[in-house]
């Protein structure tokens, strides 16, 4: 199974606190777009981002992402650079009238993209040819050298798991407090039932991270969230890679973990991918780190939405609870991580 496959579910979110009228005015002022239709899309797995489909009077569609701030400028500059330098499979932000890749409106950041009509590869699957193409495109990304004015905005991997402290805070809260909220109460019960597993995930992530900070590793340009829910396929079989928000410099295993099977048996899709990507040496310790870190991130993120985020609505809490529980399902990311060897080993993949 592809690592991260629980993303097949979409976690609904509420609309941001900004009117449609204000959005339309902002698009006209900053992008010279006269929107005639605007539709909120309750999709995505990012609690700080909101999606809209916008249509102009000429029926030209756009995809508008509204964020509560931009934490990683590389997520804008890198796809724009890749697109401008011939990587057609990249969806990049469009420029404003002043040639910026975003515009600040009140407490929000507006980012406008072309609207691609298609389906997530995770939902519809990919052909052998598309898996090969995916491998080839990711290899191109990994060997890309960025100019200094862009690379200075790309953060390097630190191997310090940023969600670890939040997971610990939540674990302390769950084990010491009582809850009246229905979703908090249900998640607290489930969390306590899985206390030992969660503790193991956090401890192993931190331990492996410490080891990797003392290891000489090659860093490449990584998308960092390149599961197949972030690959769009059109009816014409074109492929587009979206959601570059987590872009960073890191070992290639950061991206390859989404493709490598959870066991030693190579799936057909995995083999097709590497037919396109080419021969590669896999650092087993780095692969283990990213699988464990991903689990801790999901535990912290879903848990935070239920316990810590004050403006989480009922829908967000419900879907976050479901997402949290699903992490522990057979064959999902936690089982895959726990079955990943975490000794220092390099293995060839071809």
Region roles according to the model:
Residues 57-153:
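ATP-binding pocket architecture of kinase catalytic cores
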Residues 124, 128-192:
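A cross-family kinase active-site recognition segment
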Residues 47-55, 63-64, 93, 203-256, ...:
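Active-site acidic catalytic loop and adjacent metal/ATP-binding pocket
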Residues 2-39:
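Juxta-kinase regulatory segment immediately upstream of eukaryotic protein kinase catalytic domains
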Residues 110-124, 172-184, 296-314:
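A glycine-centered beta->alpha junction motif in the catalytic cores
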Residues 252-285, 292-310, 320-328:
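Active-site activation/catalytic loop segments of kinase-like enzymes and analogous catalytic loops
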Residues 33-56:
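ATP-binding glycine-rich phosphate-binding loop
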Residues 173, 300-350:
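ATP/Mg2+ or Mg2+-diphosphate-binding catalytic cores
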């Amino acid at each position: 199974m592809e690592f991260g496959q629980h993303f097949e579910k979409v976690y609904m979110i509420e609309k941001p606190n900004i009117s449609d009228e204000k959005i339309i005015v902002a698009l006209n002022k900053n992008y010279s777009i006269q929107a005639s239709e605007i539709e909120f899309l309750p999709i995505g797995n990012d609690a700080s981002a909101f999606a809209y489909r916008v249509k102009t009077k000429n029926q030209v569609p756009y995809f508008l992402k509204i964020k509560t701030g931009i934490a990683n400028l590389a997520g804008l500059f890198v796809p724009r650079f890749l697109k401008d330098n011939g990587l057609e499979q990249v969806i990049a932000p469009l420029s404003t009238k002043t040639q910026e890749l975003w515009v600040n409106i009140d407490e929000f950041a507006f980012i406008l993209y072309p609207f691609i009509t298609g389906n997530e590869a995770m939902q519809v699957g990919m052909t052998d040819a598309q898996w090969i193409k995916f491998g080839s495109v990711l290899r191109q990304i990994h060997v890309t050298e960025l100019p200094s004015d862009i690379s200075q905005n790309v953060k390097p991997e630190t191997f310090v798991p940023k969600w670890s402290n939040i997971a610990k805070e939540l674990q302390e809260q769950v084990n010491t407090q009582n809850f009246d909220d229905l979703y908090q109460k249900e998640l607290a019960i489930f969390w306590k039932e899985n206390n030992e597993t969660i503790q193991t995930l956090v401890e192993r992530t931190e331990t492996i991270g410490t080891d990797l900070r003392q290891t000489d590793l090659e860093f490449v340009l990584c998308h960092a969230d390149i599961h197949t829910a972030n690959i769009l396929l059109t009816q014409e079989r074109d492929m587009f890679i979206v959601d570059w928000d987590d872009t960073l410099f890191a070992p290639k295993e950061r991206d390859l973990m989404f493709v490598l099977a959870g066991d030693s048996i190579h799936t057909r899709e995995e083999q097709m991918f590497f037919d396109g990507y080419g021969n590669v040496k896999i650092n087993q310790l780095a692969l283990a780190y990213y699988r464990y870190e991903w689990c801790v991130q999901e535990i912290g993120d879903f848990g935070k939405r239920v316990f810590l985020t004050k403006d989480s609505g009922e829908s967000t809490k419900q879907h976050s609870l479901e997402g949290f529980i699903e992490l522990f399902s057979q064959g999902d990311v936690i089982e895959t991580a726990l079955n990943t060897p975490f000794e220092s080993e390099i293995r060839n993949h071809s």
